[in-house]
Amino acid sequence: MKKLVVIAATCALLGSATAAWAAGDAAAGKAKSATCTACHNPDGNSTNPQYPKLAGQSADYLTKQLMEFKSGARVNAIMVGMVAPLSPQDMEDLAAFYASQQIARSAADPALAPAGQAIFRGGNLNSGVSACMACHGATGAGNPAAKFPALAGQHADYIELQLKAFRAMERANDAGQMMRQIAARMTDQEIKAVSSYIQGLQ
């Protein structure tokens, strides 16, 4: 219980932080996005569930991820090549473009949604899993100031991959190791259920 309180308090503190980067130019970002479309589609709504939807995501969060792919703080064999030629301004512009797009909504698996909702809204007190909504909001809209991503409508497969990557310590660019600590306490079934619920959030 104490760990849950600490995580929630950390979320609140980070939520008061100001954005670290200036806003980019969405029109310039659209002009620079041709390479991105192969995986993420022209409007940022990827149809391959292994690749994230970028549409509607916080610009600050997207910029942070691009910068961390480039610095090596976040590791992905495909993205490291994609970000290599990008300047900080390019990253801000691309982030602004995708943030300006509308995410395409999807449906949750009705067999998994109830268990997923329980984890998303209440966590698991017995195992110390914090409620997802503590940092990502009740509707999954995220917290742009803290660079906590919007989750609603994201591919369930992608969410599941990322939670398992955090759990395996293969992804390590989360603030204060929060996601690694939470994912480490989650079962495969909890991960699958909450990922499906998130996909169906409107």
Regions found by a protein language model. Name each.
Residues M1-W21:
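Gram-negative bacterial Sec-dependent N-terminal signal peptides
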Residues S16-S33, T47-Q50, S100-N126:
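Electrostatic cytochrome c docking/interface patches
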Residues A20, A26, K30-S71:
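The feature marks the first
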Residues C36-P42, L94, V129-A138, V194:
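The canonical Cys-X-X-Cys-His
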